[in-house]
């Protein structure tokens, strides 16, 4: 009887921890999207005001395409997370999905911040410009809450491999 109660307690603790991990990873994914959106907004303001070759950077097709691509990645990621939130709130077990959301959102966040920094040129690397902080802050997202490699391992296990 003692071992049975002990086992039940361990299972309750494990279930509670897993539920908290699910919520933490979903929260991290949501934060990554918000952070990427902030970096994009900051960059949009910059390319509308910065001039090169006699015109605003926002007039160059390559830059317009680059920013359109980043905005699309952010929106698609946000939509995925928006789908998970009510399911999580209803108590659905979403280990695979929140692992996907955490790793994907933090990778998108890093890509957005990296590519936005690139559009600032040398200014992007200077600490006087907020985009440099966006870039630095984005890097750690792929580490905490479980590294993205761990997220991929969890996803693979959920796929039965």
Residue ranges and their predicted role:
Residues 1-13:
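Single conserved hydrophobic/aromatic residue that forms the stacking wall/gate
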Residues 19-161:
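Alpha-helical interface subdomain recognition
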């Amino acid at each position: 009887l003692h071992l049975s109660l002990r086992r039940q307690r361990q299972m309750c603790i494990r279930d509670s921890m897993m539920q908290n991990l699910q919520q933490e990873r979903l929260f991290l994914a949501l934060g990554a999207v918000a952070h990427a959106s902030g970096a994009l907004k900051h960059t949009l303001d910059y390319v509308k005001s910065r001039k090169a070759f006699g015109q605003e950077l926002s007039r160059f097709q390559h830059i317009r395409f680059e920013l359109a691509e980043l905005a699309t990645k952010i929106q698609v990621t946000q939509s995925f997370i928006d789908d998970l939130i009510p399911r999580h709130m209803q108590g659905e077990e979403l280990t695979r999905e929140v692992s996907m959301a955490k790793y994907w959102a933090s990778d998108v966040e890093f890509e957005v911040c990296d590519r936005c920094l690139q559009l600032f040129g040398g200014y992007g690397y200077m600490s006087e410009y907020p985009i440099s902080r966006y870039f630095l802050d984005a890097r750690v997202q792929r580490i905490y809450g479980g590294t993205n490699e761990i997220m991929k391992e969890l996803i693979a296990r959920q796929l039965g491999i």
